[in-house]
């Protein structure tokens, strides 16, 4: 039987491991347990495996997640403003109502992702891929879509694109267009 003190130590160790960016934490009853927390994080977590994590409401602004794997993660209402996501994988992730304001997401992959009502104002999506992503009511105000592939994005409207910019390499659904970035 563990004493209250030992339980407190185990809990503290799990929290410290989660804050240090560990993907797994020790669980006293065997096997590793996945920690699904929504902490505040500001730092560098390049090439981290956060696939399948529950990060709803996480505060991760001003951070560097370049090359990280967020596939199948739940990031609803997460705040990742002013963060770096170059080459990150958000395939099949749920970013509903997430804040990606001024985020840098060049070459990020959003295949099958849910981005409904996400705010990506001022974000850089240069060469990002949005195959089968749901971008219904996503805010692209002042976003850079140069070279991005949105051909199969669902819910994309001309009104959204009127607030963004792109270039001749930007791929859009038939009938939609985007103004050139200066």
Predicted regions and their residues:
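Tandem repeat scaffolds
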Residues: 2, 22-182
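Hydrophobic helical h-region of N-terminal Sec-dependent signal peptides
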Residues: 10-14
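C-terminal segment of classical bacterial N-terminal signal peptides
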Residues: 15-23
